[in-house]
Each structure stands twice: as structure tokens, then as C-alpha cells.
A protein has these predicted regions:
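Short loop/turn segments at connectors of secondary-structure elements within structured domains
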Residues: 118, 129-131
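Short coil-to-beta-strand transition motifs
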Residues: 104, 113-120
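Acidic-enriched and Gly/Ser
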Residues: 1-109, 124-127, 134-157
Length: 157
């Protein structure tokens, strides 16, 4: 009796900063195909069956949370061709800028992920020239600089 073919797809997990090396080692040891973009290494793309992806996160092999497709309210599945193109782009062009599709709007708490202010946390304010990062000492003083969206990530991610 023939068995149904397994549906393998790309699933996306958001992890904490600095976890990518451990996750890469675990997934390699388990023989699971995956991709972690170097310039946005809180995203882990898993190429596996949905049930196995769920088990990896539930068992703590990959610590994080899945990205959900808000239209279908199911785990986001990245189409094969789209993932191949993305991997090719960021592999062949290491300076390609990976930017979050999460809107960074006035009031968003962010962390600087590259450049001389890497590691600094602050709040985004809008200005005519783009966005500014503000670091405040409440009720006393605040300092701000113009910064590019690609240099910051929302803190909740």
C-alpha cells in the first residue's frame, strides 16, 4: 500500500540574539536542512515536515517561536523558489541588507544591530530626514542620532 508523500516546506522560527551558533550545531547534528542569514541571524529557516518543525521547537532543540501567516493563522511556509532566491541573494552578495518587514514607527523600542552604536537600545522618532534613535534618561535628558532602518531591529523580535 503506497504511503502519502511527506510535505516538506520551509518554516521560520524567530530566536533570541546570539543563539544561532548553538542552533546551527544542533540542526546539523540532527541532519536537518536549515538556513540562518548571517546579517539577520535571529531568523532560522527550517526545511522539514510541519510536525517535525513543531517537535523541534516544542522539545527545545530550537528555542524560539514560529512566524505565523496572519492571513491563514497557520505557520508561515516559504515557497521553495522564494527561499532559493533569498538564500542565493544573501549568499552571493554578503553585503545584501536584510531588513525586517516589521514596521519601525514612531515610539518603537529598538536595538542597534550594526555600526558604531551596535548594542544600544532606544526609541525611534520620526524626522524629515528619516528616523532618529533616541536614548533617554527619564525626566532629565535624551540624545538622538539619525539612523537607517537596516541598522535597527525591534526589541520584541
Amino acid at each position: 500500500m503506497p504511503t502519502a508523500a511527506l510535505h516538506i516546506s520551509w518554516f521560520v522560527v524567530i530566536t533570541r540574539w546570539g543563539q544561532w551558533k548553538k542552533i546551527t550545531e544542533r540542526l546539523a547534528a540532527l541532519g536537518i536542512r536549515h538556513f540562518i542569514p548571517e546579517s539577520y541571524n535571529t531568523l532560522v529557516f527550517l526545511y522539514t515536515e510541519k510536525e517535525r518543525a513543531l517537535n523541534l521547537v516544542n522539545a527545545g532543540e530550537v528555542k524560539g517561536r514560529f512566524v505565523v501567516d496572519h492571513g491563514t493563522r497557520t505557520l508561515l511556509e516559504v515557497p521553495e523558489k522564494q527561499m532559493e532566491d533569498f538564500i542565493r541573494m544573501v549568499t552571493e552578495y554578503p553585503d545584501a541588507e536584510c531588513t525586517s518587514q516589521v514596521p519601525i514607527v514612531k515610539g518603537t523600542r529598538v536595538k542597534v544591530v550594526r555600526g558604531p552604536l551596535k548594542g544600544v537600545e532606544g526609541e525611534v522618532v520620526e524626522s524629515p530626514s528619516g528616523i532618529r534613535l533616541v536614548v533617554r534618561i527619564p525626566t532629565l535628558i535624551g540624545a538622538s542620532v539619525t539612523i537607517t532602518r537596516g541598522d535597527v531591529r525591534p526589541l520584541e523580535y
